[in-house]
């Protein structure tokens, strides 16, 4: 069995799945496996009384806004109140991508490709919590979690009739926005578009478009959590993630829905990488990312396909088992990430929280968003950093010292 352990101040072991090969036998990519493990952990949150929010289906079939299998997409909405009654936070769900017919067909049998399999209620924790002691700046906002069932970060617009696949992420995005505007978002005086992992990438891709939905008087910003996927070589020198993204962009007809400010001078696959977008964006953006992102270590840097000898097997699952040479390689990845955000961080309107943890997605989990023992940089937790930036209380450009200096991390270990 696969166990996910949270190592740091909190240690927990939770059985979550089966061995990697069994996942591959069931036509799910390793990328989806890691997403399932890490998002699955939130179901075992230490929050003893979490807010449960019901699923609302979006009646967008007439416009073609459907999941991979043709079912209706959906979202979870918890209404704001008091000073937050006209403030809106839209959280885009993550969950990997599908880059070929086989993996997309598999997703049709899961919540990542069909609303038939989506949870009818979800816990709202972290940035979605309704408790001031857990979510000090956004607890009373209208908070929405838009479910992810297209496999291309809400960006595709095509179909494959032979496989009965609908690639309609872009239409899902538009139908959801229209539905939320009709439900009061059109009157927002403050708005934040956020997302985790594949949803964090989507928040970057859609950020400027989101800004344009509102009048100039509305305060609009964006937040990407664990969405800074780097166009980097794997341990064999190959381009695992570029090949993956190329498949997604080609299969799902993503090209025409990418920001024109990028596609007017770069190829579409390059424009699916945040590093080619973030410095050109007009809307203020905050990036939260672990410098040693466990998803990228396991699925981009050292996937099993790039490591046939198994030399990286132990290290990719547990940083405590990395050799000095492997740690140097991972330090190089951190340095590449810092180079990518250097120009972006020069803009006063942008914000940054890059901690030296082995983690992935830190805003929806209560223990990493805002708790007594949350990860901190210069004594500032993620929730406080994001709030200070959004409300212009302070300029926030927080970059951690390299591993292993940060003792506040909630590092993930897989066994």
Curated annotation (Swiss-Prot):
Record EC number: 3.1.1.-
Database matches in Pfam families: PAE (PF03283)
UniProt key word Zinc-finger: no
CC per GO annotation: extracellular region
Induction: In roots by the parasitic nematodes Heterodera schachtii and Meloidogyne incognita.
UniProt GO BP: cell wall organization
InterPro entries, per the entry: PAE/NOTUM (IPR004963)
Signal peptide from the UniProt entry: 1-20
Keyword Cell wall biogenesis/degradation: yes
Deleted gene: phenotype: No visible phenotype under normal growth conditions.
Highest taxon of the lineage: Eukaryota
An annotated Gene Ontology molecular function: hydrolase activity
Xref: PANTHER family: NOTUM-RELATED, PECTIN ACETYLESTERASE 12
Function: Hydrolyzes acetyl esters in homogalacturonan regions of pectin. In type I primary cell wall, galacturonic acid residues of pectin can be acetylated at the O-2 and O-3 positions. Decreasing the degree of acetylation of pectin gels in vitro alters their physical properties.
Family of the protein in this entry: Belongs to the pectinacetylesterase family.
Protein name, UniProt field: Pectin acetylesterase 12
Organism from which the protein derives: Arabidopsis thaliana
């Amino acid at each position: 069995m696969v166990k996910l352990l949270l190592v740091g101040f909190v240690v927990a072991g939770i059985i979550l799945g089966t061995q990697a090969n069994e996942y591959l036998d069931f036509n799910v990519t390793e990328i989806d496996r890691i997403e399932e493990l890490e998002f699955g952990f939130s179901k075992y949150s230490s929050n003893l009384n979490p807010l449960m929010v019901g699923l609302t289906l979006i009646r967008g079939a007439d416009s073609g806004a459907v999941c991979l299998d043709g079912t209706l997409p959906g979202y979870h909405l918890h209404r704001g109140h008091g000073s937050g009654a006209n403030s809106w936070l839209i959280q885009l769900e993550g969950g990997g991508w599908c880059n070929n017919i086989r993996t997309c067909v598999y997703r049709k049998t899961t919540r990542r490709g069909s609303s038939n399999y989506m949870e009818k209620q979800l816990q709202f924790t972290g940035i979605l919590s309704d408790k001031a002691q857990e979510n000090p700046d956004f607890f009373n906002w209208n908070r929405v979690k838009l479910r992810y069932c297209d496999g291309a970060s809400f960006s595709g617009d095509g179909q494959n009739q032979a496989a009965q696949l609908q690639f309609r992420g872009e239409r899902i995005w538009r139908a959801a926005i229209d539905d939320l505007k009709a439900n009061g978002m059109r009157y927002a005086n403050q708005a934040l578009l956020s997302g985790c992992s594949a949803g964090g990438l989507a928040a970057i891709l859609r950020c400027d478009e989101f800004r344009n939905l509102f009048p100039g008087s509305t305060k609009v910003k964006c937040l990407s959590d664990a969405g800074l996927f780097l166009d980097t070589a794997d341990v064999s020198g190959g381009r695992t993630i570029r090949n993956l993204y190329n498949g997604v962009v080609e299969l799902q007809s993503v090209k025409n829905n990418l920001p024109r400010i990028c596609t007017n001078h770069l190829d579409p696959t390059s424009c699916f990488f945040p590093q080619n977008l973030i410095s050109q964006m007009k809307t203020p953006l905050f990036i939260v990312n672990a410098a040693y992102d466990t998803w990228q270590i396991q699925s981009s840097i050292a996937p099993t396909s790039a490591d046939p000898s198994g030399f990286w097997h132990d290290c990719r699952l547990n940083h405590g088992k990395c050799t000095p040479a492997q740690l140097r390689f991972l330090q190089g990845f951190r340095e590449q990430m810092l180079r990518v955000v250097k120009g972006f961080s020069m803009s006063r309107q942008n914000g940054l929280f890059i901690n030296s943890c082995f983690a992935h997605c830190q805003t929806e989990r209560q223990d990493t968003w805002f708790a007594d023992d949350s990860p901190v940089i210069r004594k500032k937790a993620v929730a406080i950093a994001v709030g200070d930036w959004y409300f212009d209380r302070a300029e926030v450009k927080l970059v951690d010292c390299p591993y292993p200096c940060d003792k506040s991390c909630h590092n993930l270990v897989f066994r």
